[in-house]
Regions:
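Structured soluble/peripheral alpha/beta segments that form catalytic or ligand/cofactor-binding pockets
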Residues: 1-332
Length: 332
């Protein structure tokens, strides 16, 4: 299927210049090692500001599962949760911190040859590309998850690369909706994940110490989207419609931060997306370590409204599209 975004560059840094832009397809590595010395950032600065993570979301009519492995340079962290959409409550919510390198890793390969792991006492998480799928394993906090996100015949992935105020640059690979096989056992229940819809977020950047964003992501067989308003501007705003990857304009989030389980509205200034989000529940966490702090809330729910492939195209009605929003602030 044709689209308006170019193919990815061979590398993030070419001839001393960062390849800023939006691209359709996969890049081998998210690697900043070729940044020239003229950027004036030493090794200690880069170590403190280099942030890498992989996030996976899995959605069915019964449950939503979210998990991530994060390398913030001076610390590793991970979380996993299972939300029961029928009872509207968390069946499990686990998180842990670990020492860099000793507790795991987030490698620079975002999709192909992806290999991210986290280990702590009695817990393990892994996201690996094996054969034609992303294999996801979680044994932590009462969650026993085995899932495969199928990569074959997938619509184009997004690669977004852009400058960061107070940092240097950021890059992310966002997946379209990916078919899932597998199962999860939690709280004495077993849920079949065959037929679920999954997504991957692989991000890697040299970010500012204070970073904030609003994010929304949802996927179905024919329509999906990724939106962000915050530190990365509109670089990662895209719509997948009938297997075509369509760049979107700036995203706007209308919600009550004090009551995140009230309805949200998300829309883009190009008129291609206008959706209402109805939360069913949320995972949230607030942490303050003095030198580092974070506020995080990720509601789970459904989107309804309309999207368009172009300003002159007829609107496509969206109903019951399962996904998440997020309000996140970090000092890291």
């Amino acid at each position: 299927m044709s689209h308006s975004l170019p193919a990815p560059p061979a590398s993030l840094v070419q001839q001393g210049q960062v390849s800023h832009g939006r691209y359709a397809g996969l890049i081998d590595r998210l690697d900043w090692s070729d940044l020239p010395a003229r950027h004036g950032k030493g090794r200690i600065w880069q170590w403190l500001h280099h942030k890498r993570w992989q996030y996976v979301g899995l959605a069915t009519e019964q449950v939503f599962i979210g998990l991530a492995i994060v390398d913030v340079g001076w610390c590793h962290t991970a979380f996993a949760y299972v939300f029961d959409r029928q009872t509207r409550r968390l069946l499990a919510d686990w998180s842990a911190d670990g020492l860099p390198r000793l507790s795991g890793e987030v490698q620079d390969e975002p999709v192909l040859r992806a290999h991210s792991t986290f280990r702590s006492w009695g817990a393990s998480l892994a996201i690996r590309q094996i054969d034609e799928a992303l294999q996801v394993q979680v044994q932590a906090g009462g969650i026993d998850l085995e899932a495969s996100l199928l990569l074959t015949q997938a619509p184009p992935f997004l690669l977004a690369v852009g400058p960061i105020e107070g940092g240097l640059s950021h890059a992310t690979q966002k997946s379209p909706g990916l078919p899932v096989t597998g199962q999860v056992s939690v709280a004495g229940k077993r849920f079949d994940l065959n037929g679920a819809m999954g997504c991957l977020d692989s991000s890697n950047g040299l970010l500012a110490r204070d970073t904030a964003w609003r994010w929304a992501c949802a996927h179905g067989p024919d329509v999906g989207f990724n939106l962000q308003d915050g530190y990365f501007g509109q670089h990662e705003n895209v719509l997948w419609l009938d297997r075509e990857l369509i760049p979107l304009g700036a995203a706007h989030f209308e919600f009550d931060a004090r009551q995140p389980l009230q309805p949200w509205r998300v829309w883009t200034d190009d008129g291609l997306l206008d959706l209402r989000f109805h939360p069913e529940g949320a995972r949230q966490q607030d942490r303050n370590l003095g030198f580092a702090a974070s506020h995080y809330v990720q509601p789970v729910g459904t989107f309804a409204g309309q999207v368009k492939a172009s300003p002159d195209a007829p609107p496509r009605v969206v109903t019951g599209l399962v996904g998440v929003t997020e309000d996140h602030r970090s000092r890291w």
